[in-house]
């Protein structure tokens, strides 16, 4: 059976340091089969430049009409079997969140 894949979506517009903290909490995961899709509405605060170079992070910048439009746009970029939305400033509680989630999904 193939390993479950996750798409973690973060939508933002000028999020400041919150974006990096959210992305870092995902990068700290022990489970490795995920992508991070950052859908940016046109930030000018330099927050995108703070993101580390990592092949699991993909950034898409395109104007949107608000958070829900941004979420809908982001869905066209995801490739994972399961999608999780995180707001800027949200953190995954510990480094095993995706591991536990994958275990639950595999039992279904």
Description of each model-found segment:
Residues 1-28:
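N-proximal low-complexity "stem/linker" segments adjacent to membrane-targeting elements
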Residues 17-20, 45-53:
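Acidic helix N-cap motif at the loop->helix transition within catalytic regions
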Residues 19, 67, 86, 92-97:
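Hydrophobic/aromatic residue at the end of a short beta strand that borders the catalytic acidic motif
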Residues 33-42, 60-63:
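Short beta-strand/loop segment that forms part of the nucleotide-sugar
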Residues 40-49, 87:
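A conserved acidic beta->alpha catalytic loop
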Residues 61-78:
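Glycine-rich, basic loop-to-helix element that forms the pyrophosphate-binding segment
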Residues 83:
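Short aromatic/hydrophobic "clamp" motif used to bind/position activated sugar donors
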Residues 91, 95-108:
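Conserved donor NDP-sugar-binding/catalytic core segment of glycosyltransferases
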């Amino acid at each position: 059976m193939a390993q479950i894949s996750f798409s973690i979506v973060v939508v933002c517009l000028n999020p400041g340091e919150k974006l990096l903290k959210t992305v870092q909490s995902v990068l700290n995961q022990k489970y490795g089969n995920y992508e991070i899709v950052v859908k940016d509405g046109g930030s000018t605060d330099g927050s995108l430049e703070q993101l580390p170079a990592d092949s699991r992070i993909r950034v898409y910048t395109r104007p949107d009409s608000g958070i829900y439009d941004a979420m809908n746009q982001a869905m066209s970029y995801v490739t994972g079997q399961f999608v999780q939305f995180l707001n800027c400033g949200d953190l995954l509680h510990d480094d095993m969140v995706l591991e536990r989630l994958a275990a639950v999904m595999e039992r279904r």
